[in-house]
A protein has these predicted regions:
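Bacterial N-terminal signal peptides that target proteins for export
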Residues: 1-14
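Sec/Tat signal peptide C-region and signal peptidase I cleavage site
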Residues: 20-28
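Hinge/capping helix and adjacent helix->loop/strand transition within the periplasmic-binding protein
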Residues: 29, 33, 104-112, 118, ...
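Short, glycine-/small- and polar/acidic-enriched structural segments
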Residues: 29-147, 217
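Ligand-binding cleft/hinge of the Venus flytrap
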Residues: 51-61, 102, 153-171, 186-189, ...
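Short helix-initiation/N-cap motifs at beta->coil->alpha
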Residues: 66-77, 166-186, 199-202
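A ligand-binding cleft/hinge motif common to bilobed small-molecule-binding domains
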Residues: 80, 88-104, 157, 161-164, ...
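C-terminal lobe and pocket-closing loops
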Residues: 209, 214-274, 309-310, 317, ...
């Protein structure tokens, strides 16, 4: 009886060990994927949530999660540290990271583009009664140039410089995200703010729809030529169309820059291929969350819109679809 009990125990131990080994294999196959996005008042976060949802539903053994962050600069640092596998970023911030410039002087970040996604439009926002009609009128005013972890600050500084202003001497500068900037301008704590994002940005829509306030967008497309001369051909002159936000009755002449979804240098070709293929072919599911995803198109996958190289896995998919990449 004792011998049989020992045999049974041994058999159970073997079965249990085999079960643990099998569980380990299953666990190893499960991939978690952190996606750096932005603040809850912007466009990166809802789009990132939609991207995470599509990838989790469409790719076997993948669990993707959209992370709230400070924006492009924070996202690129998360990529550098290995805390995020993918991230949204503006092209200018990505180039700075790749080259170890500006906010990335502590070290270059190895980056590869997965997808060119949509253009970010610079908003220079104020309200009636602020005395601000042109960029020159920002002199002496209280102005938010974006949060420290976002790329709004990067581009805002360049727009201000190209407009002939000094960001440190010519204005009282705050460093607020878009939602915080909207609250501050409502409370009359600031006179204007910079925000670079998709159309519409929820927080800006909230300001435009606020009773008793008339939001104004300041033209600044004249800064594009000087910015490109100094920083490379990253920016284009564009417009925020009349009606894009409640109460806006004329086009706003602006500077814009393209957004990318990027990864570091660790993602396999197979994973990159599967991710890009899924995002392009499931675009309609993402558009249902935010219309800027309309730009997740093959026509936009050109090197001129991405200053960093495309991942080989992405290029494989583009080539299959007749796009050079």
């Amino acid at each position: 009886m004792l011998r049989r009990t020992k045999r049974t125990a041994a058999a159970l131990a073997i079965t249990f060990s085999a079960g643990l080994a099998l569980a380990g294999v299953v666990q190893a196959q499960q991939k978690t994927m952190s996606i750096g996005t932005g603040g809850t008042g912007g466009v990166y976060y809802p789009l990132g949530g939609a991207v995470a949802n599509v990838l989790s539903k469409s790719l076997p053994n993948v669990q993707a999660t959209a992370e709230v962050t400070g924006g492009s600069v924070d996202n690129l640092k998360l990529i550098a540290s290995g805390q995020s596998e993918m991230a949204f970023t503006m092209a200018d911030a990505a180039l700075d990271a790749l080259q170890g410039q500006d906010k990335f002087k502590s070290g270059k970040v190895p980056l590869q583009a997965l997808l060119v996604v949509y253009p970010n439009r610079m908003h220079v926002v104020t309200v009636e009664g602020s005395g601000i009609e042109t960029m020159a009128d920002l002199k002496g005013k209280r102005v938010s140039t974006g949060s420290p972890g976002g790329a709004t600050e990067v581009m805002a500084f360049r727009v201000i410089e190209a407009a002939g202003l000094d960001k440190d001497k010519d204005m009282k500068r705050e460093r607020l995200g878009v939602a915080e900037s909207v609250n501050a301008i409502k409370d009359r704590k600031i006179d204007a703010f910079f925000w670079v994002g998709g159309i519409p940005t929820a927080a800006v829509t909230d300001l435009a729809a606020t009773p008793g306030m008339k939001m104004k967008l300041i033209d600044h497309s004249e800064t594009v030529e000087k910015m490109n001369a100094k920083y490379g051909k990253l920016y284009t002159a564009s417009k925020i169309k009349a009606g894009a936000y409640p109460g806006t009755d004329k086009d706003n002449a602006i500077a814009e820059v393209w957004n990318l979804i990027v990864t570091g240098d660790k993602m396999s070709n197979d994973d990159a291929y599967a991710i890009v293929k899924t995002l392009v072919e499931k675009k309609a599911d993402i558009v249902a969350v935010h219309k800027e995803a309309e730009s997740f198109s093959l026509d936009n996958q050109i090197q001129e819109r991405s200053p960093i190289p495309f991942h080989p896995g992405a290029l494989k998919y583009f080539k299959e679809k007749g796009i050079g990449g």
